[in-house]
């Protein structure tokens, strides 16, 4: 708002005074961050963080898309952001358990970010701090998700949001501090078994075939839901 020299930025939920480097009202999620001022911007790191009204799932613009970056600077949702928001909303409708996973991530004290994959040949993945994961420490994550392709690196065809549900299970495990490295008798990580069970809930809704393998290894039938 440049009228009459006020020069405040409208962020939707709050207005920001650039001269002070502070919002003019308190953060509605202030109770989640007792160590910080309720008027601060981006966790006091405006270079590395973006304020998104306090939500704990952050959908970032496609890092490879110049148009996406331009739109985000002017306060618009980009094509990628709109698509991911729609996928998250549909996942909530698809299955109650998956809906609870998403809701708990949204309510988490950790920040869970969803952004576009950097290399489509490698497919979706979830980035975590491996040291924290090994120690069972709760943490935030970055999910790299491609909502535009139905073909996995393995060659399998499936609905894109099936892959998102898989990665969100990893985010949930990281958030809960349960992203440890236990394996099945034939060497499949239990975190992957949980993620496969989660995505199979969505496959039932999309009509995609039930997944029973991780890579070339069969998941023990007794562990499949």
Each predicted region: which residue ranges?
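Short, ordered secondary-structure scaffold segments
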Residues: 1-10, 19, 132-139, 144
């Amino acid at each position: 708002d440049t009228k009459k020299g006020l020069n405040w930025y409208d962020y939707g939920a709050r207005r920001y005074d650039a001269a002070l480097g502070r919002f003019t009202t308190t953060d509605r999620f202030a109770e989640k961050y007792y160590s910080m001022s309720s008027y601060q911007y981006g966790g006091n790191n405006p270079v590395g963080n973006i304020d998104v009204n306090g939500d704990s799932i952050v959908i970032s613009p496609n890092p490879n898309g110049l148009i996406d970056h331009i739109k985000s600077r002017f306060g618009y949702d980009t094509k990628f952001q709109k698509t991911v928001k729609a996928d998250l909303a549909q996942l909530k409708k698809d299955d109650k358990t998956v809906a609870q996973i998403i809701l708990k991530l949204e309510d988490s004290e950790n920040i869970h970010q969803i952004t576009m994959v950097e290399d489509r040949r490698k497919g979706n993945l979830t980035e975590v701090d491996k040291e924290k994961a090994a120690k069972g420490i709760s943490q935030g994550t970055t999910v790299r998700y491609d909502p535009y392709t139905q073909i996995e690196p393995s060659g399998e065809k499936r609905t894109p949001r099936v892959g998102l549900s898989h990665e969100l299970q990893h985010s949930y495990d990281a958030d809960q501090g349960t992203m440890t490295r236990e394996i099945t008798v034939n060497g499949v990580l239990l975190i992957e078994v949980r993620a496969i069970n989660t995505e199979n809930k969505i496959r039932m809704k999309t009509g995609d075939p039930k997944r029973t393998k991780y890579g070339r290894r069969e998941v023990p039938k007794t562990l499949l839901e």
